Amino acid sequence: MADPSSYRPAPGTIPESPGVYRFRDGTGRVIYVGKARNLRSRLNSYFADPVNLHQRTRQMVFTAESVDWISVATEVEALQQEFTEIKQYDPRFNVRYRDDKSYPYLAVTVDEEFPRLQVMRGAKRRGVRYFGPYSHAWAIRETLDLLLRVFPARTCSSGVFKRAGQVGRPCLLGYIGKCSAPCVGSVSAEEHRDIVNGFCDFMAGRTDAMVRRLEREMAEASAELEFERAARLRDDLAALRRAMEKQTVVFGDGTDADVVAFADDPLEAAVQVFHVRDGRIRGQRGWVVEKTEDLTAGDLVHHFCTQVYGGEHGEAHVPRELLVPELPADVEALADWLSEHRGSRVTLRVPQRGDKRALLETVARNATDALARHKLKRAGDLTTRSKALDEIADTLGMRTAPLRIECFDISQIQGTDVVASMVVFEDGLPRKSEYRRFIIRGATDDLSAMSEVLRRRFARYLDARAETGEAGVESAGDPDAPAGPDAPDEPRVGTLVDPTTGRPRKFAYPPQLVVVDGGAPQVAAAAQALAELGVDDVALCGLAKRLEEVWLPDDDFPAILPRTSEGLYLLQRVRDEAHRFAITFHRQRRSRRMTESALDRVSGLGEVRRKALLRHFGSLKRLAAASVEEITEVPGIGKRTAEAILAALADPTGQSEPRR
C-alpha cells in the first residue's frame, strides 16, 4: 500500500472551485470518484489525518497512488460529472446500488388504433400512458391478469395481432374472455377504446363509480334470473377488489412522490423507497450498500438521487416530490439536477407531520428491518471469504491471499464447437463484467484447448505491459510524479485503462491465481503455456471433479483440503461458475450451428438479402455453383459481398472463419 503523503498534491495547486476528483491505484484504475463544493477543502480532508479516517475511506486512501481532479463552474455541473464518471469507471470504493435496471411500468399505447396494455421499462415515449412504477414486473402482470377479466383489452404484440387478423382466429386470451379480440372484428375500434379508457380510469384511482356499476348490473342480472351473467359479474367485482387491495390509497390529494428512508451502521446502510403515484403506493424497492466514508442522512440522500435517478432511464421515474429524512447540503443543486432529468420541477422536503410523516416513519421501519435481516444473513460473510482466501494461499504456498482469481474451463462434444470460458472472482466474489468467452478453432481436445486459451489470455496481458514498458508500471506510484492539474492526461500505465472509457482494457489485469477445471494433465498443459510466455508470477492449480483434489504443477500427488474447508468451497464455486459459463456458450453455438445456413455467417448479409438470393437461385447448391458476376445480378449484392458468399459456401463448417 502507498503512503498517502507520497502522492498528496500541494495545497496551493488545488483550486477552491466546485469539481470532481478521482483517486487511482498503481495501474491507473479509478477506484473512487467524488464531488466537492470546494476541491481544496475536500481533498485536504483526506490527507490531514488519514489514520483516523472512516475504515473504508482509510483503505481507499492507502490503496490509491495518485489523485487528480477537474474543476467546473457550478455544483450542478459537478453533480452531473460525478454521476457520469461513476457510471463510466465503476469505482470499487464508491457506494453501489447494484440493482441498475430501470423501473417497470404498466403502459397503455393510447396512440394506436387498438391500444395495447403491456409492461415497459426505460425512457417514456410519446403517445403512451404510464402507470407505476412497480417494484417487480410480476406484480404488474398479476394486477393486469386480474383486470383483464373486467377490461378485456389487447395485450399482444403487433405481429401477433396482425397474424390473428390474417387467419381470422384470435389467440387463447380471446377464447377465454380475457381479450375482446379486436383483431378478428369481435369489437370495433371505438368499443375497444372504451374498454381501454375504463381500464385507465380504474388505474388512475377512479374506482368507486365502476364498483357501483358492477354491483348494480349484478343485482339486475340476478333479478332477471340471469344467474350465469350475475356469477360472471360477481367474479369481475371480486377481481376488481383484489386489484384495489394491491393499491392502497395513502394520500387523498393524488400525491406523486417517492418516500425514501435509511437505516445505517458505521459500515453499511439500508435504503428503502416507497413509490406513491396518484396517492397510491405502487411499489417498493430496497438496497443495502457499503459506506465508504462517514455519511450523514443528507449525504445518503445525495448518493441515492444521483445513482438511482440519473442515467439513461432516469427521466422515466423521477417523481414530482421526494420525501426524505434529511435534506443534503447541496439540496438546491440536487433539485435543479433532478428537475433537468424529469423535465419539470422536482422538490425535496422533510415531512414534519400528518400522513406523509407517518408514511416516512413506516418506510424507516422497513429500512431498519432490512438492515437487521441483512446483517444477520451476512454476519460471517466477510470473515468467511477472508478465511477461504487465506486457506487457499496456505495450501498453494502463496505469500498473500489471491484477491483476483481466474478460472478456465473447456466445453465441447467430440471436438466440435470447442469453446472456453474465463470467470473472475475478486475478493472472493464474482466479477461478472470481467468474464470472457473464447472460440477455440485450432484444438480438438481439452489439453490443447486449455493451452490455447491461456496463451491467448496472457499474450493479451503481456502485450498491454509491453506497450508501456516495465518502467511505467514500476513508477506508477512515484512520489515525485506531478499530481493534480500538472499530472499527465493519462497514467503512464494508460494501456491498462482505456482512455476513452476509463475502464480496464480486456485482460489488462493479471490474476494472483489461475484455476483450471481438471487434474494433473490440465494443470501440466496450463503450466507449459504460462512457461512458454514467461509468466512466472501467477500461481496455478487445478480442481479435479469427483474427489475434489487440488493439483499443483510438478507435484506427483494432489493437495487434499478438508471437505468442510472454506477454501475448498470457494474453489468449487469458482470452478462450477466457469463450467456453467462455458457450457452455456457451447450450447448457444451448437444450437446456432444446427439451425443456421452458411449464409448466416456472411458479415453484413441480412435476412432480406438472404431471402432474395434464395428466391433468385432456388437453393444453396445453385448459389454455390454461381459465379461472382451472376450473384451480383441480385439487387443489393455487390462484388465484395458476392465473394464473401462464395467463400462461406465453400467452407460450410465455418472453421476457417477469422478469429474475433
Curated annotation (Swiss-Prot):
Stored Pfam families: GIY-YIG (PF01541), HHH_5 (PF14520), UVR (PF02151), UvrC_RNaseH (PF22920), UvrC_RNaseH_dom (PF08459)
UniProt-annotated stretches for the region Disordered: 469-501
Entry GO CC: cytoplasm; excinuclease repair complex
Keywords: Cytoplasm, DNA damage, DNA excision, DNA repair, Excision nuclease, SOS response
Gene Ontology biological process: nucleotide-excision repair; SOS response
Stored SUPFAM superfamilies: C-terminal UvrC-binding domain of UvrB, GIY-YIG endonuclease, RuvA domain 2-like
Ranges of residues in domain GIY-YIG: 16-95
Molecular function, one GO term: excinuclease ABC activity
Domain named UVR: residues: 208-243
Record keyword RNA-binding present: no
Subcellular location(s) per record: Cytoplasm
InterPro entries listed in its UniProt record: GIY-YIG_endonuc, GIY-YIG_endonuc_sf, GIY-YIG_UvrC_Cho, Hlx-hairpin-Hlx_DNA-bd_motif, RuvA_2-like, UVR_dom, UVR_dom_sf, UvrABC_protein_C
CDD domains linked: GIY-YIG_UvrC_Cho
Ranges annotated as biased composition (Low complexity): 476-486
Assembly mode: Interacts with UvrB in an incision complex.
Similarity comment text for this entry: Belongs to the UvrC family.
Role noted for this protein: The UvrABC repair system catalyzes the recognition and processing of DNA lesions. UvrC both incises the 5' and 3' sides of the lesion. The N-terminal half is responsible for the 3' incision and the C-terminal half is responsible for the 5' incision.
Identification of the protein by name: UvrABC system protein C
Source organism of the structure: Salinispora arenicola (strain CNS-205)
Organismal lineage: Bacteria, Bacillati, Actinomycetota, Actinomycetes, Micromonosporales
